[in-house]
Amino acid sequence: MKPQLLGFHHIAIIASNYTRSKHFYMEILGAKQLNETYRAERDSYKLDLSFPDGSQIELFSFPNPPPRVTTPEACGLRHLAFKVENIDEYVAYLLGKEVSCEPIRVDELTGMKYTFFRDPDYLPIELYENNY
């Protein structure tokens, strides 16, 4: 019998400015802190964040991380997507927090609304309206 994957446990993100990214994910996006660890030997932090559905983000800081490759179609993680109940309401909230969002579009395959914005390190983040 083939073993089964149960789903995603976490996404790991390396921040160029730990304090700014911690504020963004917790204060703007509403993630809850599970644990924060400072590792002196690495001069780095690891912050475990959680969302209501149990999904998690591990936010890391390192003294001199290399910059992110900006080509959006390069191999690797393309974007992070969050599901929301009302995309119009969430976009209005983000705009009120001075977070720029692309215009809301409709997925031609599913008929669901979606949009993109960026985190403090320009990681593309998608909002996807979840009506089911």
What name fits each language-model region?
Residues 7, 43-45, 76, 111:
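Exposed loop/turn and edge beta-strand positions of beta-sandwich/beta-sheet ligand-binding modules
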Residues 13-56:
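Core segments of cupin and vicinal oxygen chelate
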Residues 80-87:
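Mid-chain, well-packed structural core segment of small domains
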Residues 59-60, 70-74, 78:
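Helix-adjacent hinge/juxtasegments
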Residues 34-36, 43-44, 64-70, 103:
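A short, acidic/glycine-rich surface segment
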Residues 1-4, 37, 48, 91-132:
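Vicinal oxygen chelate
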Residues 1-19, 77-80, 131:
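N-terminal beta-strand motif that seeds the catalytic metal site of vicinal oxygen chelate
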Residues 52-56, 64-65, 87:
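Short, charged/polar surface micro-motifs in flexible loops or helix N-caps
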